[in-house]
Amino acid sequence: MSDRIDRDVINALIAGHFADPFSVLGMHQTTAGLEVRALLPDATEVWVIEPKTGRKVGKLECIDSRGFFSGVLPRRKNFFRYQLAVVWHGQQNLIDDPYRFGPLIQEMDAWLLSEGTHLRPYETLGAHADTMDGVTGTRFSVWAPNAQRVSVVGQFNYWDGRRHPMRLRKESGIWELFIPGAQHGQLYKFEMIDAHGKLRIKADPYAFEAQMRPETASLICGLPEKVVQTEERKQANRFDAPVSIYEVHLGSWRRHTDNNFWLSYRELADQLIPYVKWMGFTHLELLPVNEHPFDGSWGYQPTGLYAPTRRFGTRDDFRYFINAAHQAGLNVILDWVPGHFPSDDFGLADFDGTKLYEHSDPREGYHQDWNTLIYNYGRREVSNYLVGNALYWIERFGIDALRVDAVASMIYRDYSRKEGEWIPNEFGGRENLEAIEFLRNTNRILGEQVSGAVSMAEESTDFAGVSRPQDMGGLGFWYKWNLGWMHDTLDYMKLDPVHRQYHHDKLTFGMLYNYTENFVLPLSHDEVVHGKKSILDRMPGDAWQKFANLRAYYGWMWAFPGKKLLFMGNEFAQGREWNHDASLDWHLLEGGDNWHHGVQRLVRDLNHTYRHHKALHELDFDAYGFEWLVVDDNERSVLIFVRRDKVGNEIIVASNFTPVPRHDYRFGINQPGKWREIVNTDSMHYHGSNTGNGGVVHSDEIASHGRQHSLSLTLPPLATIWLVREGE
């Protein structure tokens, strides 16, 4: 044999330490002629086969008993398609040689991936079914620029890293290989010799499906088809649309009563979605569904950013669930976690032996609160991985909005860190400039590529312009959670009513900054865990007063400017904190009609009334849409305001946050006439005392509060009422 392969190369190849397998394996032109080489551990005999005729072209000689074969093909001068007939343990198998195929990734894709500007990197990286030269199989690719060798291991090769070492594309740091016969549903991982010579086995960062914990392999699974954005779904996200969000943790909304096991995606489609629709919500927000190893993280520590968790079924089951939501007229919001990732060995941590996805300095790359790692947004390939993921969920699953978790932890380098535990940016400041640019870029691309889909920020500081356009210096989100409103109002509501007069500003302060952002008013999962108590249990007083306070608060919230968000269980006043390992307390709604039914009916009525009246949602972010009528009656803890639509139709909202009914309470109004009470949280329908105004009241030409006309109302105890004008 001429051009004999060096024994050291064979040893390195068999040991799994050779970085350029295509320079050795496959078909090569040598001085002796056309030569085929193959590494086939445990094989005893190998023939080169002509596929069209099935004729044996030549036999490969066993050069090394560990499985290295080579042979020159007589009378063959030009490259041709071939197969290998391999005898393993007495059985002959006909296989296609992975090393006869050329480079997989197109030069333009490789360049865009290296530049970090490939809009859809998941279409190139990961595992994709393909047909090459008439051969079906799967093409694999993974970014690991500092690895010494990378192999695909899986069910198709006995998890043996010697059998399928990959080709390194040095210009991009991407390893690639087409494996004939690797099929949909088979498990795989990437085995690599890392930068320090250590053996690592990693799940695919771009896997479209993965095993459920405690198993960690990726699944070969084709790229899901695109989901068309409908005009109705786009309209439902608009600033002037009614947006009422039901936030759900799929693993604990409801469970099987016999074994406490989760409902599947399809069972949730049959049970959860009709319930959310019946309750009148417009949007369904899901706590993260990305694959994650630790149940107690609620999904906020993902390892499979492109894979829906298998806890509740397959990827196609999840697509079925989303489609069912759309068919019911619900938009779907996905909690998205681009801020950090866990340090599990099979995940992104130390991916190729270097800090590839994270920062090398723990003062930048380690999150102390959650024991997680922070993405290095300044590395183009990393930010591209994340931006592509945002598009992936919207385009390939039909997600209508992304709610970005823990934005403050991303944009501040000193977040939850003491002096000396963080590194300033290049200008000496505390802002994470790379994270800010990443968020702006992500939102810009969403606006350009999937117009109508939106993003929402959970941002807990006063960072300016979170929901303002990038060209105005903002981050470009469409909406921001108003955590200040949430804290202030809950702090107010937990007070004994006798003390509320001294904290009146906690309910009024929100309007001083209301138009600085496009706000969502959130009563989220974070407010019913870790000893904070349930929303109901924070209310003061005896049982009657607790429920009355809660109903009054909900009436206030649904009328206040801003979109609405309510975590599951709060809609029927669950008494205990949320437990991710158990179902909600649905038994509270069993038996006879009770206070919990009353709250549930109220939330349903609030949703339907809110959606019906444009004054309650059309001008959330326009000062014309809100006006105080009574803002200074702190002694009686009464607040009254007007909500207004674009053409001037008004709804009056009056709240009495004391247990004392206020009879003949007069206040000035803008529009005289007949006003109908459309919501009264003290109604007997909601198990209140049924104090009210008999349905209809008429204005008087009596001046009050600087206005010529006024209304005289009975304000029920611990209640909120809404009134709509019906005419002169």
From Swiss-Prot:
Entry's EC annotation: 2.4.1.18
Active-site residues, as the UniProt record annotates them: D405, E458
Domain of life: Bacteria
Keyword flag Transferase: yes
SUPFAM superfamilies assigned to the protein according to its UniProt record, in alphabetical order: (Trans)glycosidases, E set domains, Glycosyl hydrolase domain
UniProt GO molecular function: 1,4-alpha-glucan branching enzyme activity; cation binding; hydrolase activity, hydrolyzing O-glycosyl compounds
GO cellular component labels: cytosol
GO annotation, biological process: glycogen biosynthetic process
Biological function: Catalyzes the formation of the alpha-1,6-glucosidic linkages in glycogen by scission of a 1,4-alpha-linked oligosaccharide from growing alpha-1,4-glucan chains and the subsequent attachment of the oligosaccharide to the alpha-1,6 position.
NCBIfam families recorded: branching_enzym (TIGR01515), PRK05402.1 (NF003811), PRK12313.1 (NF008967)
Family according to the record: Belongs to the glycosyl hydrolase 13 family. GlgB subfamily.
Assembly behavior: Monomer.
Name listed for the protein in its UniProt record: 1,4-alpha-glucan branching enzyme GlgB
Organism: Citrobacter koseri (strain ATCC BAA-895 / CDC 4225-83 / SGSC4696)
